[in-house]
Amino acid sequence: MFTAFTTKDLMPSFAEFLAKNKPKRAPKFTFASLFSGAGIGDFGLVLAGGKCLAACEIDPQRAAVHKANIGAPVWGNLRTEKASIIKHLRGLDLDLLIATPPCQSFSTANSRRGLREDPDHAGRDERNNLFFEALEVARKVKPKIVFFENVPNFLKRKIQSQDGTVVGRVEEFLSAALGGYRAHANVMCFSSLHVPQRRRRSIAIFVRNDIDKTTAAALMDPACWPGALKERPANILDAISHLPELDSSQAELAADADDPLHQVPLHEGVHYSWISDIPARSGRSSWENACSNCGDDSTPIFQVVCQLCGQAMLNRPHVLQKDGSIRPIKGFKTSYTRMAADQIAPTMTTASGHFSSDLKLHPTQNRVLSARECAILQAIPDSFVWPKEQRFRKAYLVREMIGEAVPPLVTFRFGKAIVKTLTS
């Protein structure tokens, strides 16, 4: 049995992890993946010695990326193909079932505290019930380990049962359905596993009761997982500053000719000034830009007329009105904001290419992060393949796939813990 990782379980550096390739040795455990996305999280399991026996992803573009990297059979719609997946997996002595249901309706932005307590509201979005489909697969296949990952609100969301007769929180439904398993459910920040971003997520780990109790306890405690890094980025610039500089003002400056993922959207005219007038390394917002006419910086945020000289502050986010005047754009202080240079990155999201979104601007350069930088901050190894067919429209779809993924460093460390559990 094991209780924690030892010094021999340490990996030398974050850079070494990014340089990892798929293992060529015989697989050490098996897994199936539901709501697999592009297979980014599954890639970490493969790096740890896992063999994917089945995946399920409804979007053809994401499924294509999964196939290019994982090579497992991929089913489409879990609701309509669930029976086929169960038939395929039964009798295979599955070690792990991992499920990452769609999270949009559970997210902080779309699930205010009051709505989190409203099961009727939850019932209006059919995606909220998809985890029930995963539970049915788990109950019928009976893998040794079941792993759910989702946004922080996921476990506490009140929801109705599929027949509408029972109301409870998601974590209560999970525990009730998996009664033959020991359970651990919690919200954690993946930075504690050495991912260089603030990424708070719900995780729920279930270990079948026939697994040794002490061994199961260590598997369910992320602090005990092997694969910790001896060297890791202290801040965002430590992680990404080795890449060529980019600038969003001109097309020839906005892309790296040697890396199709290292490119950024263009911002011209006043939009570029909203970014360029934010001091580098300041962590400030364009709402705080000094007046470009007189240099005064005392005008309060969300105001676009200088209180000293009375001129329009075109370098702050605004909308031009029919009469020629401007009004401030409605938004939050964290929109149009540089990331802090001396901290790890904020959460990588599917909206990484939108500079108006929350904390999306590079700490020192005049642009958003590139998809390559987002991939690094999500701890996605360089060996992960991005087929050309999925890199259209300046890789916006790649950005979505990156933002919604479980960081492979997390699943790699979980996979290493599974290997220790199964070989104890």
Feature map (PLM): residue ranges:
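Conserved Class I S-adenosyl-L-methionine
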Residues: 163-183
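Secondary-structure boundary elements
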Residues: 140-144, 176-182, 207-218
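Core alpha/beta nucleotide-donor-binding catalytic domains of modification enzymes
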Residues: 2-145, 151-168
